[in-house]
Amino acid sequence: MRRAASRLRVQGIRVLALSVLAIGLCISRSAIAQEKAPRFRVVVLAEQGGIHKPFVDSATEWLNALASQNDFAVDYIETTEKIDDAFLSHHQLFIQLNYPPYNWTPTAQAAFVRYIEEGRGGWIGFHHATLLGEFDGFKMWPWFSKFMGGIRFTDYIPGFADGMVTVENPSHPAVKGVASPFLVQKEEWYTWSHSPRANVHVLASVDEKTYSPGTKVKMGDHPVIWTNEHYKARNIYVFMGHHPDLFQNPAFATIFRNSIFWAAHQDENP
């Protein structure tokens, strides 16, 4: 009887140990599966060095925190060398973080055009993305100019200025919940050959009368946030993106966050 009871106890211990091991393996596999399957994946083409580095560094820190909180993954690249159809197929959102629309490889250009025109993913561009013209020995990219409303860069405010931005379409998901107007400080407001309004859906514009200090660098009707609905991809251009303190601006941070989830088709439950 004692031996039988002893054997039963040993068998019970073994069963318990195997059960604990099985549970542990299930938990481990579940954790690994979650790590391998983020909610969605973002690629960030970020300009490095020069005057834009502080903003890009702040954006990277902010993005990493947002990604951790919302279970999406971010991959950073600093050149267009990796960009092709296969690379972009792994990303539901492309963020052009102050990277200009020139110095792209031909393969990257062609893949990006397909990505946007066929709606393979979403796009958010900041600031330098409308530096359209002939720069650093590169010709203007005509397709990208059309994508941005047919504009060409003409001038900017080198000494920076504060300005009040008015939300024109508060019902759009990208600007939902943003107080209007809101102040943007220390920005080097660009001017373009003309307003893109006729070719895009304007979400917000800057009131040039509110520039402080005042300046002669103006263009009249001055959109600063817009989307081009002629393309299948959900896309947002946000002009602001020079000063790192923008991430302390609730309006800017909200627009960036909203735009990510909207452009990546995740806005149903951000």
Label every PLM stretch briefly:
Residues 1-11:
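N-terminal secretory signal peptides that target proteins for export/translocation
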Residues 150-232:
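Catalytic beta-strand/loop cores that center a nucleophilic Ser/Cys/Thr
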Residues 35-40, 46, 54-57, 62-69, ...:
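Extracellular ligand-binding/catalytic regions of CAZymes and related secreted enzymes
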Residues 36, 41-132:
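Helical hinge/lid and interdomain linker segments adjacent to catalytic or ligand-binding clefts
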Residues 102-177:
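A glycine-rich, often tryptophan-bearing local segment used as a flexible ligand/cofactor-contacting loop or short
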Residues 29-33:
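Sec/Tat signal peptide C-region and signal peptidase I cleavage site
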Residues 50, 160-162, 179, 242-249:
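Active-site rim elements
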Residues 14-27:
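Bacterial N-terminal signal peptides
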